[in-house]
Design a protein with these regions (language model features):
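Short beta-strand segments
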Residues: 22-24, 74-76, 171, 195, ...
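Compact, glycine/acidic-enriched structural inserts
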Residues: 23-56
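Short acidic, glycine/serine/threonine-rich loops at helix termini
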Residues: 33-35, 84-87, 180-183, 204-208, ...
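Active-site cores enriched in adjacent His and Asp/Glu residues with nearby glycine-rich loops
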Residues: 120-190, 196, 200-203, 238-306, ...
Length: 375
């Protein structure tokens, strides 16, 4: 989609100074079921590629290139069927299909920098995404089921000719980071955590997180946690500028959370030390954000170490290792800012039993399982 603007099952090859699309024309059977379609040649010419060959010709083409000593560059395959094709074409077993680093870095160098036209598309996707979240806030009430709220959000996407950019998270059990179950009945006092986005026909994606009180207003306890999470978000946005490593913004958001939770009696000690040691991850076990574009986690299949770390190794520390973007921000980058505060019973129990970070976590933290998760 990025390299030749096509969604159809075709293969694009660049060989020195020429570009070729390998694919097959539709048969009458295809036309009966799919209707009249542009020919392969017409679709190729729309994106400036004039040479086309049948898909069956790709194997001999690649084999000849290898025999001539040419290096065949390819991106890491994301789908299982592509792994099988690469094994058929190049004889590389799926376990060894790591992709070509120079090709990966070249694509990342292109796609990390969004053009004005791309940014306009992402803004449209984010506008629809925001409307989806607002609709959830409008319709939610005790007695509804989660799937009823999700249906209203989906309707907003469909009414704007959009698909979902990823499977919607919409749940009263927000302590589970990736919870796609929507069968719970919403009760008075519940918080409804949403992580959802819209995808435009062009392929560009939106992604936002929000937390909605079922009763339309927060309880005092919920509001206290919300204010900390909101401060994490606002301080992170305020810190954004070209040149600042996004990992520094992550650390800032974590320090803001630690200071806030100290005010609630849940954490103690020096915030810088707590974040450096990783104590904050009891309540903040995920990253702050990621690149956005044609993928909601843009270029996820190319590897975070290249997209978000420019080849540098990632941290292995719990919480910090989930940060997808660490490199200095540059003009043209588009990324999310999604801090959260989570109270995960199983994680809290494990840390309590192991007496982890007692210099930073008050024992009272382990009795506050009723505190709300806010993202």
């Amino acid at each position: 989609l990025h390299l030749c603007d096509r969604r159809q099952r075709q293969m694009c090859i660049r060989d020195r100074d020429k570009e070729i699309i390998f694919g097959d024309e539709l048969t009458i059977d295809h036309i009966v079921w799919m209707g009249t379609q542009p020919t392969l040649k017409e679709k190729s010419e729309r994106v400036g590629i004039r040479e086309t060959l049948p898909s069956a010709a790709i194997i001999s083409y690649l084999h000849k290139a290898v025999q001539k000593g040419q290096t065949v560059h390819y991106l890491p395959p994301y789908r299982p069927e592509h792994k099988l094709k690469l094994m058929d074409w190049l004889g590389i077993p799926p376990a060894r299909q790591e992709g070509s680093v120079p090709f990966i870095r070249a694509v990342v160098a292109q796609r990390n920098y969004k053009s004005a036209e791309e940014i306009a598309e992402i803004e449209k996707a984010c506008d629809v995404t925001a409307d989806m979240h607002i609709k959830a806030m409008e319709v939610i009430r005790p007695g509804m089921y989660e799937y009823e709220v999700v249906a209203e959000m989906n309707r907003v996407a469909e009414m704007n000719n959009c698909e979902l950019s990823f499977p919607t998270i919409a749940t009263i059990n927000g302590q589970t980071l990736h919870n796609h179950y929507h069968g719970n009945k919403i009760k008075s006092g519940d918080l409804f955590l949403i992580d959802a986005g819209a995808e435009l026909p062009s392929g560009y994606c939106g992604d936002m997180s929000s937390t909605v009180p079922a009763d339309k207003t927060f309880t005092s306890k919920q509001h206290a946690v919300y204010e900390i999470q909101n401060a994490m978000h606002l301080e992170s946005v305020k810190a954004l500028r070209p040149g600042i490593p996004y990992m520094e913004v992550y650390d800032l958001s974590a320090r803001v959370m630690v200071e806030g939770l100290k005010g609630l009696g849940l954490m103690k000690g020096n915030a810088d030390d707590a974040v450096r040691e990783g104590a904050h991850a009891l309540f903040y076990p995920h990253g702050l954000g990621h690149m956005m574009g044609l993928d909601v986690h843009d270029m996820e299949n190319l590897g975070e170490v290249w997209v978000g770390y420019n080849g540098q190794p990632k941290s292995t520390q719990f919480g910090r290792k989930s940060q997808r973007l660490a490199i200095p921000l540059e003009p043209g980058f588009v990324h999310t800012v999604e801090p959260g505060i989570y109270f995960i019973p199983e994680l809290i129990d494990m840390w309590k039993e192991g007496k982890k970070f007692t210099d930073f976590i008050n024992s009272v933290s382990y009795t506050h399982l009723t505190l709300p998760t806010i993202a």
